[in-house]
Design a protein with these regions (language model features):
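Class I SAM-dependent transferase core
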Residues: 1-66, 70, 100-117
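Conserved SAM/SAH cofactor-binding pocket of Class I
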Residues: 54-137, 147
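Helix-to-beta-strand junctions that scaffold the AdoMet/dcAdoMet cofactor pocket
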Residues: 87, 154-156
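A short SAM/SAH-binding and catalytic strip from SAM-dependent methyltransferases
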Residues: 133-147, 151-152, 166
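Conserved beta-strand signature within the Rossmann-like core of class I S-adenosyl-L-methionine
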Residues: 157-167
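Active-site capping/gating segments
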Residues: 167-209
């Protein structure tokens, strides 16, 4: 698996590799009890879940790394758990409204000893007193709704990183028709291609005014 990541300039340390393998094992086992993912093949897991989660942070030019992240609708831990594993210096808040999935995230947190992770079992719009540098979301809801949820949680000039499929332009067009556009400084798209013809991805970066 290391060769896949090396091609993108990403180095997996032995410790990180072990934790990623352990994460995969936990996910596959718990997936038998609750619906976490349809992806069970190990190569697909590493490409469509792990690589997909971290690529925006390695392939976006002039990116200033955040000190804190809030992940909306973390589900099975993508991208939240993955970002916490790759960047242990960043504090990561995982929000998940479904109890069974939140308990899964707690299990992963404790098993992998992720001291930089906090799991909150609630809807993101109900969470109070949490301000972060970056809000992320992957396969949760439309862009306009995500921005509406994210803005109150961001520090001044904080950013949003929303993982989308290649056909995201209509969502951006709809977002620009709303009043929320007046609250953001800029929108940038980072496009990347997953190996083994596993798809095109777009990360929508949005900066708060």
């Amino acid at each position: 698996m290391k060769d896949i990541f090396n091609k993108f300039g990403i180095t997996l340390s032995p410790e990180l590799s072990l934790k990623l393998d352990k994460f995969y094992s936990i996910l596959i086992e718990e997936n038998k009890k609750i619906n976490l993912t349809r992806i069970v093949d190990k190569t697909e897991f590493y490409v469509k879940h792990i690589l997909d989660s971290v690529l925006p942070f390695f392939q976006t030019k002039d990116l200033v790394m955040p000190k804190s992240i809030l992940d909306i609708g973390s589900g099975a831990g993508f991208p939240g758990i993955v970002l916490a594993l790759f960047f242990p210096e960043i504090q990561v808040i995982l929000t998940e409204s479904i109890g069974k999935k939140a308990r899964f995230l707690e299990l992963v947190k404790h098993t992998l000893e992720l001291k930089n992770v906090e799991v909150i079992n609630d809807r993101v719009e109900k969470i109070q007193n949490k301000q972060v540098d970056l809000v992320t979301a992957r396969a949760v809801t439309d862009l306009t709704t995500l921005v509406r949820y994210a803005l109150p949680k961001l520090n001044k000039h904080g950013k949003m990183c929303f993982y989308k499929a290649a056909k995201v332009v209509p969502e951006i067009t709809e977002f620009k028709k709303t009043k929320l556009i007046n609250l953001v400084k800029e929108i940038k798209l980072a496009n990347f291609t997953l190996p083994f013809e596993m798809g095109e991805r777009v990360c929508v970066w949005i900066e708060k005014k």
